[in-house]
């Protein structure tokens, strides 16, 4: 059984790794689109959107209600991509923690 110093060292290393990954996630940028690419959104890892671009043809083709639905679709797609990318970055730390618990 590992002694207390070894356990504390493991916890410290994992904490540092989590902080490093968190900084990496916050710095990443995710781009997503609506189904037919009428709307493109870009968001940062901290969840803030940095741009929402609407194709001018969509503005001529759809009414306000449809445009809002298309924007919402692109935003939700972006949030989903961000969640997946964040989970992928944190997966090694989570697996490592599980192996320590076992």
Predicted regions and their residues:
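Amphipathic alpha-helical coiled-coil segments
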Residues: 11-14, 18-21, 25, 75, ...
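Conserved "boundary/linchpin" sites in short secondary-structure elements
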Residues: 50-53, 91-102
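C-terminal structural segments of small proteins and small subunits
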Residues: 71-96
């Amino acid at each position: 059984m590992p002694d207390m110093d070894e356990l504390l060292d493991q916890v410290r290393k994992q904490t540092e790794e989590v902080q490093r990954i968190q900084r990496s996630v916050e710095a990443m940028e995710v781009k997503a689109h609506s189904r037919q690419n009428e709307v493109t959104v870009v968001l940062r890892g901290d969840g803030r959107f940095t741009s929402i671009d609407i194709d001018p043809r969509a503005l001529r083709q759809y009414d306000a209600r449809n445009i809002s639905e298309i924007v919402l679709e692109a935003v939700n797609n972006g949030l989903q991509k961000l969640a997946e990318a964040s989970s992928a970055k944190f997966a090694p730390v989570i697996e490592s923690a599980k192996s320590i618990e076992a």
